[in-house]
Amino acid sequence: MNKLYIGNLSENVSPTDLESLFKESKIPFTGQFLVKSGYAFVDCPDETWAMKAIDTLSGKVELHGKVIEVEHSVPKRQRSRKLQIRNIPPHLQWEVLDSLLAQYGTVENCEQVNTESETAVVNVTYANKEHARQGLEKLNGYQLENYSLKVTYIPDEMATPQAPSQQLQQQPQQQHPQGRRGFGQRGPARQGSPGAAARPKPQTEVPLRMLVPTQFVGAIIGKEGATIRNITKQTQSKIDIHRKENAGAAEKPITIHSTPEGCSAACKIIMEIMQKEAQDTKFTEEIPLKILAHNNFVGRLIGKEGRNLKKIEQDTDTKITISPLQDLTLYNPERTITVKGSIEPCAKAEEEIMKKIRESYENDIAAMNLQAHLIPGLNLNALGLFPSSSSGMPPPSVGVPSPTSSTSYPPFGQQPESETVHLFIPALAVGAIIGKQGQHIKQLSRFAGASIKIAPAEGPDAKLRMVIITGPPEAQFKAQGRIYGKLKEENFFGPKEEVKLETHIKVPSYAAGRVIGKGGKTVNELQNLTSAEVVVPRDQTPDENDEVVVKITGHFYASQLAQRKIQEILAQVRRQQQQQQKTVQSGQPQPRRK
């Protein structure tokens, strides 16, 4: 994506004019400017410089009386499903952007691009060409919080004609696009890379992300990069110092890719370098260790009533604080964990903190691998559940045996059945879920592809309200996930408290015994597998549809897994009934159950 199209050119513009413009703007280019009637093409050294040219010149520079437009040059055959959206308000919530994009079709992937501009840039992959075309037409020039969006095609490698054998190899890659929110990434591997689908990927590592005061960045890099090279060699790590991010900011992020031991060793060396530089420059303020962690993992790091964090503080003799949820924006899905103490205790605290974060990540990967098998085709990375600094969720087949290999999926082309789930939320949270004039619940419904209704309160003193969600499994996953997230964002659960909600699903009364199992065996296995509390209340009177309630209580992943496993049991019961009916109709004797 380093080839540029320069449009809206005057007839008088020459290659020399464009060369001078790029040189004045300090944007390097390779080769010659190919000037046609009213437009031109040129190559930049890499994608970063191409983005810089677009940010600096497009719509901002006049040449021979005309304001030029600069965008990625995309061959017609590759103008398919991928768009780049620029000039997004920097403090826009993901939820708003998601709902806007979803109005024009199914979004498979949405990833932020690092730029030096104040506004945000994302690359979006729609499910098909028509959705992308509508998105381009409707969103280009769209006014969002006084910012005018700029939308262009970017090359879709998967649109390039291929041999049938190549297409077969690459289909799994399409189903598992790279991580959705690419904060701090240098860009994912191309989805069309030869052999990418056939070659197994290594287990994804969780890098260590630090914040360091800007004045110490030079000392960490060293003369001509000597110090940083020495650190990487000593610790067998790859270290990225994001100097261009947040120009003028007092702190800069550093990403360390290595084994847990390598990350910790590099972190300790960096702390020692900063301390020495502070002494040499008579810098008297305390320099705490600041670790960046994706918000999804912070609740588990803190633990119930803050127990995990208190234990780390006591064991390492440090003082640890975590930035508030309100600081999270489109640019920043990470919380800052500040550790105060001398170098040795801080280094020990880093090890314990990252150990907890890695455990949470691995647990989520395991849970989501199971989820991916239970909801075929579900694009988990598109929901933003994983930290951007990792490469997203690996395909379920990589290194993890399918725990549900016997699951029967709907026939090809058949839509998954709609389900109804009752989710109970704090009564005080109803306003936040509905939003001003119902805007939030409408956006959520569109994004998830589900019907979402709030049931009337059971009484004036009711502490809980029931949210009725109707839709297929993927819609349930999206809608429930967003509701869990909204409750945490709006502080209906404390900063040291994990969001656990009660969910009710109805099952036919004749199938309740299958959910419970002999002597409660099935329900106990369900609870062990999912970490959710699953209860089928005894002595229930079936409703008018001959159904009874199964109650599930747990955090989001636990609840989702329990719901999927119960639906799987119900599907098995239905299949057996259908088989028995066919057998009865054909007059054949029924096979004896073992």
Swiss-Prot record:
Protein name: Insulin-like growth factor 2 mRNA-binding protein 3-A
Alphabetical UniProt keywords: Cytoplasm, Developmental protein, DNA-binding, Endoplasmic reticulum, mRNA transport, Nucleus, Repeat, RNA-binding, Transcription, Transcription regulation, Translation regulation, Transport
Bilayer-crossing regions: none
Chain intervals with Low complexity compositional bias: 161-177, 399-411
Major site of localization recorded for this protein: nucleus
Domain KH: 205-270, 286-353, 418-483, 500-566
Highest rank taxon of the organism: Eukaryota
GO molecular function annotations of the record: DNA binding; mRNA 3'-UTR binding
Function: RNA-binding protein that acts as a regulator of mRNA transport and localization. Binds to the RNA sequence motif 5'-UUCAC-3'. Preferentially binds to N6-methyladenosine (m6A)-containing mRNAs and increases their stability. Mediates the specific association of Vg1 RNA to microtubules. Binds specifically to the vegetal localization elements (VLE or VgLE) in the 3'-UTR of Vg1 and VegT mRNAs. Binds to the Vg1 and VegT mRNAs in both the nucleus and the cytoplasm. May regulate mRNA translation. Acts as a transcription regulator.
Organism of provenance: Xenopus laevis (African clawed frog)
Gene that produces this protein: igf2bp3-a
InterPro entries associated with the record: KH_dom (IPR004087), KH_dom_type_1 (IPR004088), KH_dom_type_1_sf (IPR036612), Nucleotide-bd_a/b_plait_sf (IPR012677), RBD_domain_sf (IPR035979), RRM_dom (IPR000504)
Family: Belongs to the RRM IMP/VICKZ family.
